């Protein structure tokens, strides 16, 4: 099966995601590195699925251990720098300003963001089309604002 067919059957259908668009490569394959279009609500469903360790409505959708493996940093993109962003399986791993909490995020072109903060049970989605933003700061700015809003 092609990736888009597999995702539609095994991931999107169980989550009730029906309105998707996946860009394709010149050979007709799904552009799986970043060509998926979802509504904000459906993107939040993916975040919630990760927040709940791959279980949706009592049913395991993702293999046991997949969430932990996919959000474990494999690459440090800015070694030795404060708040260095690390990368797992298509997830950016972001330490908070105080280093006490870690979030992970799917960051899309133009400001599309899915941020999950497991320790605080937060799933946040941002959509937009600011293709001129400075990519180094936006994920942290969003995370800092989320945490400030829920801090006592």
Where in this protein do the model-derived segments appear?
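Active-site Gly/Thr loop motif
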Residues: 17-20, 68-123
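Active-site rim elements
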Residues: 30-34, 103, 132
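A beta-strand-loop signature enriched in Asp, Gly, Thr, and Trp
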Residues: 22-33, 53-82
